[in-house]
Amino acid sequence: MTTVAASTRPQRAEGRGHLAAKLFDGRTRIRELYQEGAAKIRLPDTFDASMEAVIINTAGGLTGGDRMDWSVDAGAGTRIDVTTQACEKIYKASAGTAEVTTSIEVGAQARVDWLPQETILFDRAALSRRLDVDLDEDSEFLAVEAVLLGRKAMGETVETGLFRDRWRIRRSGRLIHAEELRLSDGVAALAARQAVLGGQVAFATLLYAGPLSEAYLGKVRPLVEGSMGGASAWDGKLVVRLAAADGFSLRKILIPVISALRNGAPVPKVWNL
């Protein structure tokens, strides 16, 4: 008698969420909403013409082999703020790489603020992330991505792992900004280099693309002065890069910068929970 061992594939978290908005009676309204698997989208009430979307991974985190896909389509004249319910945790991967893709289209005279809370990488995590944005000629876009290499208060460190982050931002089909970040293998040793993070374990990149880039630069530079970071504006875009010793120290700089790039508006309320 021959015994055949059952082969089981570990359960993986997968999800897809899509939100499209249109302008109706001067307010941003839902045009399409689709949710599948572990991806959920919630739309809290707002008291102005904008829409706030909170995206949720009901799996509670990601590990090797998981996949999440998000897409946002902001119609002409709309205003959408997109954030996450909590920090996204990327756990140790036994096999494979977690993948997250985000696609955003911003129509004429529309604005999208992409404001997810921090991504927390644990030791031996593996994450590949991609952000693709298509802008109309006169639309605005703000993106914030913050990453923590473990939680310092919990004594966590990230010695090895994989983190790939790819951004492609286009306006009227023309590439205006690209990011290509890769941390792999000896992550701690790489982060310790002065030309990389200088030993800091919390870092963030902010990008604003729109007509106010030069005006925003004058507001942002005083906020980052004295920190490990800087801000520059050119060709209709503004880029801010920050690094700090831990997540709390990063937020103390990051939140005022985000507010400045939102004409004084605060970060979404879920950031404060």
Swiss-Prot record:
Cross-referenced Pfam families? UreD
The listed locations are: Cytoplasm
Q: Name one GO cellular component term.
A: cytoplasm
A molecular-function term among this protein's GO annotations: nickel cation binding
Q: Does the keyword Chaperone apply?
A: yes
> What UniProt keywords apply to this chain's record, in alphabetical order?
Chaperone, Cytoplasm, Nickel insertion
Q: Which cysteine pairs make disulfide bonds?
A: none
Please tell me where this protein is predominantly located.
cytoplasm
- Entry function: Required for maturation of urease via the functional incorporation of the urease nickel metallocenter.
PANTHER family linked to this entry: UREASE ACCESSORY PROTEIN D
On subunit structure and binding partners, the annotation says:
UreD, UreF and UreG form a complex that acts as a GTP-hydrolysis-dependent molecular chaperone, activating the urease apoprotein by helping to assemble the nickel containing metallocenter of UreC. The UreE protein probably delivers the nickel.
Q: What family classification does the UniProt entry report for this protein? A: Belongs to the UreD family.
Record's protein name: Urease accessory protein UreD
